[in-house]
Design a protein with these regions (language model features):
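Beta-propeller fold recognition
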Residues: 1-455
């Protein structure tokens, strides 16, 4: 290929410059989903036409200072292919061009720039209905994509946070019931050098959302909006040192984390958990059944050690250096998405069974989390996953995979138990050559009715 023609031949498109494009540093992950650009008044989508592949890009961060005028808090939505992708006769025909801006949804009162969005398909028809994203002011927003036209797509604040608790990663979404969800996210930043020494208390939040109303009614329903921390149930973390024998029957000790299990009352709009000093969340949580696995990082730096100072006082040509080291740890915390609390035998969990205990009023509680040294990440491996559908059982449309035909979902997916049989090896595969076995409830035959037979 002619190198001079690279910019014209290789990229599918380049976003237009100008007043409608004030993107900052977009360090987040763009999302791709199918959207309807012409919906009915009740918010429903016709699947045979007016469906497009859209790219969702957060505005990012233009300046480190959160209140800087250069920081715009907005969600950009772009036409990806410039073709109709509905199921009707117009499928594949030209419809605009790649890179056209379908919408730019500016968040009023946004702080510090928008972070990576999460896309949600509530009815599993293959069309995205909502997006959720947070800003560096600690606020979480809901973007309703069900209006008649993209120009009418709206954003409302569902949680009011604090600039001391920035949201720099995408939220997870847990499907609690029919069009009832928990939006789960953590706070904290590891973007700027100043973040390294920041010890402000960060938190994990779960905000309840009921999305069963038409667009205008939902926008007017204040019970789903502007929730504050005082409206949430607080859960707490306890660290316990456990003694056990390893596979070689050698005595070992390890620290396990347990969450409280405070009851959610009708007045609560969700839950929250405060983290320890220096801990923060900068990665999207992973949903496994009804358990949210949150990755927590902690950075501890020493004051530095000056080398060569005495020699330099005698000889000005001798170099002086300052060595500073940082120790990192990673905690994986499994959280009951419904109340932010304890895990039982029916919950998806990854901690060894030796770390279980009895909790008053709850029964057998399995440890919620473990801590390891270093920067550790994981991939969830399930041998019984039969498809590469990018839409999860919760409706999160941000996974990798191959889209199904529109409307070809097989009903509401199961997110309460694993398919397969006892003994199947599910695991969190870690990047440090370790793995953690994942256990939980296995789906099986159940009695749904009975009657007595007389002979």
């Amino acid at each position: 290929m002619d190198a001079a023609a690279w910019s014209d031949k290789v990229p599918l498109f380049e976003t237009a410059k100008g007043k409608d494009n004030t993107l900052g540093f977009t360090i987040g992950t763009p999302q791709i989903g199918r959207v309807s650009i012409k919906r009915e008044t009740d918010g429903s989508a016709k699947l045979n036409e007016n469906i497009r592949y859209a790219g969702f890009l957060a505005s990012g961060y233009a300046a480190e200072e959160k209140d800087a005028a250069a920081n715009e808090t907005a969600l950009y939505v772009y036409e990806m292919l410039g073709k109709e992708v509905g199921t009707g006769e117009k499928r594949g025909q030209a419809a605009g061009k790649p890179g056209d801006q379908l919408a730019k949804i500016v968040v009023k009162g946004g702080v510090g720039g928008l972070s990576t969005p999460t896309l949600l398909d509530t009815d599993f028809d293959g069309v995205v209905d909502f997006a959720f994203a947070g800003d560096r002011g600690g606020n979480m927003y809901r973007f309703d994509l069900r209006a008649a036209s993209p120009k009418d797509w709206t954003a409302v604040k569902i949680f009011s946070g604090s600039p001391n608790k920035p949201i720099t990663s995408a939220p997870a979404v847990s499907r609690k019931g029919t069009k009832e969800y928990v939006v789960i996210f953590g706070t904290g930043s590891e973007i700027y050098q100043s973040d390294l020494s920041n010890t402000e208390t960060q938190s994990i939040y779960g905000i309840f959302q009921k999305l069963d109303q038409a667009p205008k009614d939902l926008a007017a329903d204040k019970t789903n909006q502007d929730v504050a921390e005082q409206n949430l149930r607080k859960q707490t973390i306890t660290e316990v040192e456990q003694s056990y024998n390893d596979g070689n029957n050698q005595p070992r000790t390890s620290k396990a984390l347990y969450l409280s299990n405070e009851k959610i009352e009708e007045t609560h709009k969700g839950w929250f958990i405060n983290l320890g000093s220096g801990e923060r969340v900068s990665i999207k949580p992973t949903m496994i059944l009804r358990t949210a696995i949150v990755t927590i990082r902690k950075y501890t730096s020493d004051g530095g050690k000056t080398i060569g100072k005495e020699e330099a006082e005698k000889d000005l040509c001798m170099p002086v250096s300052n060595n500073k080291s940082t120790v990192t740890s990673t905690t994986f915390l499994g959280i009951n998405a419904d109340n932010g609390g304890a895990l039982n035998s029916r919950s998806a969990r990854f901690t060894p069974d030796i770390f279980k205990r009895e909790l008053s009023g709850f029964g057998t509680q399995y440890a919620n989390g473990l801590t390891q040294e270093g920067i550790v990440s994981f991939t969830f491996i399930d041998p019984n996953k039969r498809t590469d559908d990018p839409v999860t059982a919760d409706g999160d449309s941000g996974e990798t995979g191959t889209d199904k035909e529109l409307g070809l979902g097989s009903g509401t997916p199961n997110n309460r138990c694993f398919s397969g049989k006892e003994g199947d090896q599910r695991s969190l595969l870690l990047n440090n050559a370790q793995s953690l076995e994942v256990k939980g409830r296995i789906c099986g035959l159940q009695r749904i009715s009975w009657r007595e037979l007389f002979f």
